[in-house]
A protein has these predicted regions:
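Non-catalytic alpha-helical scaffold/packing segments enriched in small hydrophobic residues
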Residues: 8-15, 30-33, 59
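C-terminal binding/interaction regions
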Residues: 52-112
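Phosphate-handling active-site elements
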Residues: 1-12, 38-56
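A short glycine/serine-rich beta->alpha loop
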Residues: 17-26, 81-86
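Iron-sulfur (Fe-S) cluster-binding segments and ferredoxin-like electron-carrier domains
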Residues: 35-38, 81-83
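Conserved phosphate/anionic-ligand binding catalytic regions in large, soluble enzymes, centered on
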Residues: 22-36
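Acidic-glycine-rich active-site phosphate/pyrophosphate-binding loop
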Residues: 1-16, 67-75
C-alpha cells in the first residue's frame, strides 16, 4: 500500500504505542498509525493548503469512534479490551482498526 516500504515507518510510529509512550492517556496507537498511513498516501508535499488528507483522517476518526466508542487509549483498554467479554487484546483493536482503514481507503478509490 505504501510505496517504498521502509523500517523507518515503524520507528516513526513506535512512540504512539500505548496511547503515546505507554502513558495510556492519549490517542490509541492503532488510530494514530492509521492517520499516519492516510498522511503518507494523501498528505501534502509542500506548505500549500491541501484538505484531502484532513478530510479522510476526519472520516477515519468518525469510523473509529463508531466501531469502538472511544479514541483514547485508557478508556479503550478499560471498556473494550479488558472488560469481561471484550476484545481481550490491543492486537485485536489494531486488527479491527486496520480493517476500518482498508474499508475507508477502498471507498476513497484506492485499490487495495
Amino acid at each position: 500500500m505504501l510505496p517504498d516500504w521502509s523500517p523507518a515507518y515503524l520507528r516513526l510510529s513506535n512512540g504512539f504505542a500505548g496511547g503515546v509512550g505507554c502513558s495510556f492517556q492519549e490517542l490509541c496507537g492503532a488510530a494514530a498509525g492509521a492517520v499516519m498511513v492516510i498522511g503518507a498516501l494523501f498528505g501534502r508535499e509542500d506548505l500549500q493548503p491541501d484538505e484531502e488528507a484532513q478530510r479522510i483522517a476526519c472520516r477515519y476518526r468518525e469510523r473509529f469512534l463508531e466501531t469502538f466508542g472511544e479514541t483514547r487509549c485508557a478508556p479503550l483498554r478499560q471498556n473494550v479490551v479488558k472488560v469481561e467479554g471484550g476484545l481481550g487484546s490491543c492486537a485485536v483493536v489494531c486488527e479491527r482498526a486496520a480493517m476500518v482503514l482498508l474499508e475507508l481507503l477502498s471507498e476513497e478509490g484506492l485499490a487495495i
